[in-house]
Regions:
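Glycine-rich active-site loop/strand segments that organize a redox cofactor
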Residues: 48-96
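An anion/pyrophosphate-binding glycine-rich loop and adjacent beta-alpha core
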Residues: 35-37, 42-43, 51-58, 91, ...
Length: 405
């Protein structure tokens, strides 16, 4: 039997593509290498599944063509996604601009999509490893598990390399290369950064709301704000994830990357407050004094780095040393030496070059009937539901084009 479309990968983009194509009365085969559908969806949003975000802009996406994704998200965006899930009987709720299934369970999303796939009689094969795909004349041939399937169209929805234990092992890049597509440089993104410094390890476990500024060869390349987590290996947390793409890109280009943290961004009058406290609390040691401002581990790290005795009475501290401490509170330097791997990354940066993909249909410019969607493309979003929105959008866009045939 020849299918109208074969979809390789049953993550968010693959399941959306299958439902959309089947909704256009196309005969669909969905192939998944894992034992269950949507495993990566189950891990998103700490198991709550952050579907999308109220704020949506072109700058929420990265890649060699940052503007590639946004016009398609305008075509099928947040409101369309909400309506789609409501049509399947799943309510969506909003919390501070972040959208989740009303159950706050990622399993609800996977179950809802799976139920619709079955209702539409989509053929599904799990634990199916696609080893080869080719096109001869007007037909695609997809091989794996000692079987071969035929179709008029082929959608690659395999994901990238992030979280390989959930199914994304990079196999889609080989399939795309076999069709002569270029793969841009790929690397982990939305991931923790590794840092050096003997005093930094002493801060492990600390969480601190900070302004984050990233410099590459002394040039500012990114800024963020939020709760930074200090770890044994370096720094993590949402603001670090948000800037990780730019920091890692610079590291891979052999640039010197440093992060500067304003550890007290809420204190615009830090110097004035310090002067007031000095008058009323001059009986404290330097360490005790600044523990009224910051986590004690951070205070200790700052004093150690500046070689200031933490037991020294604050009344005896010189104006020069006081200014040095205040400066470091507002410009705490973290030298970035590396980054965590794909096993800890939320998304893959880079992928199939969007220069070879038709914007608006996601069909290959090199081969008619071949489509590439989701994380496999050189498109990665920031934290907050942007990558799932892109996955659903891209699956819908590609399958809708096939549906019009």
């Amino acid at each position: 039997m020849k299918y109208d479309v074969i979809i390789v990968g049953a993550g968010a983009s693959g399941m959306m593509a299958a439902i959309t194509a089947a909704g256009h009365h196309k005969k669909v085969l969905l192939l998944e290498r894992m034992d269950k559908l949507g495993k990566k969806i189950l891990a998103t949003g700490n198991g709550r599944c952050n579907l999308s975000n109220a704020y949506m802009d072109e700058n929420c996406y990265r890649g060699q063509r940052p503007s590639f994704a946004y016009p398609m998200i305008e075509e099928f965006g947040l409101e369309d996604l909400i309506q789609f899930f409501e049509s399947l009987g799943m309510l969506v709720t909003e919390q501070n601009g972040y959208y989740y299934p009303a159950s706050l369970q990622a399993a609800t999303v996977v179950d809802t999509l799976t139920q619709k796939l079955k209702h539409l009689h989509v053929d599904i094969l799990t634990e199916f490893e696609v080893t080869k795909a080719e096109k001869c004349k007007s037909t695609f041939y997809v091989y794996g598990n000692d079987k071969c399937f035929q179709s008029s169209n082929l959608i690659l929805a395999t994901g990238g390399c992030a979280q390989p234990n959930l199914g994304s092992n990079g196999s889609g890049y080989k399939l795309a290369k076999d069709f002569h597509h270029k793969i841009t440089d790929t690397f982990p993104s939305l991931v923790g950064l590794e840092a050096e410094g003997k005093y930094l390890k002493d801060t492990s476990g600390v969480r601190n709301v900070s302004n984050v500024s990233v410099y590459a060869n002394n040039e500012l390349i990114a800024k963020e704000h939020g709760e930074v987590q200090f770890t044994k290996y370096g720094v993590s947390g949402i603001p670090i994830f948000q800037i990780s793409h730019f920091a890692i890109e610079a590291l891979r280009r052999k640039k010197k990357v440093k992060i500067y943290l304003n550890l007290m961004p809420q204190m615009v009058t830090l110097e004035e407050t310090t002067e007031v406290f000095l008058k009323s609390c001059n009986y404290k040691t330097v360490e005790e004094f600044f523990q009224g401002f910051l986590n004690k581990k951070l205070v200790y790290a700052i004093l150690q780095r500046l070689k200031i005795d933490p037991r020294k009475p604050v009344a005896q501290i010189s104006r020069k040393d006081l200014n040095r401490i205040l400066d470091m509170i507002q410009h705490f330097e973290v030298e970035i030496k590396g980054y965590k791997g794909y096993d800890m990354a939320q998304v893959t940066a880079g992928g199939v070059s969007t220069k070879e993909i038709i914007q608006g249909t996601l069909e290959s410019k090199l081969l008619e009937g071949l489509y590439v969607v989701g994380e496999l493309l050189d498109v990665d979003g920031t934290c907050g539901g942007y990558n799932l929105q892109w996955a659903f959008t891209s699956g819908y866009i590609a399958a809708s084009q096939i549906g019009r045939q």
